[in-house]
Amino acid sequence: MFGYIRPSKPHLSEQDEARFQSVYCGLCHELGRKYGFAARFVLNFDFTFLAILLSDAQEPECESCRCAAHPCKAQCVMAHTVALETAADHSLVLAWWQLRDHIEDHGFFKAIPYRLAALLLRGAYRKARTFVPEFDASVQRHLNDLHQREREHCASLDQAAEPFAALMADIADCVDDEMRRRVIDAADDFEKDAHSNCYNPLRYRYELDGDKLDEQSREAVATSLDLSVHRMASAYALLSCGVWTSILDSIFYESLYGIGNAVLKGTYH
């Protein structure tokens, strides 16, 4: 579900790469500061992107910190901000419900790793939901909606993507709705879902029986993804992002296209 929204680092300047890394590390430290060490493991690029999108347009204040991942060399870490705290709160709640979703989707033995992870995060989740109770309720509601569509074997990509898109909409109302529609997750999980006999909207949309997308289906998904990214980029163009502009340009105009193509070709890692 997570990890697709990241900049194309080879095309970033050293300054922008360091700036992005400072936010990534800042979110990690914010998760640890507020929710404990185990919470750091829910860190992902998607909520780093959210923290950037919600940050002030000016150069962020940074601190020099060491951590378990970088014990020898201090890193430049974005100092505590409302944007980081918002990203941390929402990412913790969403990660918890993603674990619960995995537990429901897998058999007893295959779900053991997810049960253990949920046990470690239970206290952090209970704390996080007190800060964002409306979002916590929203996640439950939209995931129930998603499960209902899974049980119905919904063949519409738009309808299958809608619950998670609506969930993302509840995180940041300032972000245009087109920035939240994602089909790429279904394409990335297609083979895994086929082997485990889990619901995947692409399977029903294109009436596929195997564990691979055929060429015609792949082209149709690519067209849908390109259209979605184009509309997201159009919405993004209306924002004023200051020092974050180069990083966000890289995401909207390069990275999302590249990652989508890599997923469809089976070369994404």
Enumerate the language-model features and the residues they cover.
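Acidic catalytic motifs of isoprenoid enzymes
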Residues: 1-179, 183-218, 222-226, 236-244, ...
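Membrane-proximal bilayer-interacting regions
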Residues: 247-261
